[in-house]
Curated annotation (Swiss-Prot):
GO terms, molecular function: RNA binding; structural constituent of ribosome
Organism: Encephalitozoon cuniculi (strain GB-M1) (Microsporidian parasite)
Annotated Gene Ontology cellular component terms: cytosolic large ribosomal subunit
Protein family per UniProt: Belongs to the universal ribosomal protein uL30 family.
Annotated spans, Disordered: 1-22
Pfam families: Ribosomal_L30
Protein name: Large ribosomal subunit protein uL30
């Protein structure tokens, strides 16, 4: 008696067809993502070179202007933003101080945020000056801060900065980390959106510790308050 081969159940056939179709879709998506990642990497490299060249050209023009002013006094352009670091606990602080710290998203010790330099911000900094160190920083330190400690916000989730994540969050208007730095440093119309996207920077305690008594004003040999353009001395040791 000859054996009769039974046909595979229709459900099994449909399952195999589905798995094969999904495998093709995954392969296509992976290929598209690799191509996108490669294109974004090229874009980031070209954009970084272009923006840095523009910045260094501006710096050269400033140096030339300084050297040409023999008897005059060069007044540098006011910084577009402040870096603000929470270095003292908010426990037992007045409600007004706590409110400003919350507005600045300063929730834990050794957290740094960037805020636009304007009249309103300067008033708020005076309210919290006994709990924070703040001042201005240069392009190189800003780049180091964003590249090494930067992360982005997706809803309430903290996400590592990648070109693809940035591109998705800004609908292609911004595609790399260097463009984030550019908008912050130059205070462009995208400053607010970029700054809201960046998660507060979580820093380490400063190498070598704080100079003097931390609770004393920077002008009196301590650490809190306005460091002006000397904040980089502290921030560099916390990155």
């Amino acid at each position: 008696m000859e054996g009769v081969m039974s046909e595979a159940p229709q459900s099994s056939i449909r399952k195999k067809e589905y798995e094969a179709r999904m495998s093709r879709i995954r392969s296509r998506q992976e290929k598209e993502f690799r191509e996108r990642k490669s294109a974004n990497a090229r874009y980031a490299e070209e954009t970084t070179e272009k923006l840095l060249n523009k910045y260094y050209e501006q710096e050269r023009e400033i140096l030339e202007k300084k050297s040409s002013m023999k008897n005059g006094f060069y007044v540098p352009k006011e910084a577009e933003f402040f870096a603000v670091i929470l270095i003292r606990s908010k426990c037992n602080c007045p409600p007004k101080v706590r409110k400003v710290l919350e507005l600045f998203r300063l929730k834990r010790i050794n957290t740094c945020v960037l805020v636009r330099n304007n009249k309103s911000t300067r008033k708020m900094l005076q309210i919290i000056k006994d709990h924070v160190a703040f001042g201005t920083i240069g392009m190189e330190l800003l780049r180091k801060l964003v590249y090494t400690k930067g992360s982005g916000r997706n809803g309430h989730v903290r996400v590592k900065l990648t070109n693809e994540f940035i591109e998705d969050m800004f609908d292609g208007k911004i595609r790399c980390i260097e463009e984030l730095v550019h908008h912050i440093y130059n205070g462009t119309e995208m400053f607010k959106k970029v700054n809201s996207f960046l998660y507060p920077f979580h820093l380490s305690p400063p190498r070598g510790g704080f100079k003097g008594q931390k609770s004393k004003s920077f002008n009196d040999g301590g650490s809190v308050g306005n460091h002006q353009d000397l904040l980089s001395n502290l921030l560099e040791r916390m990155i």
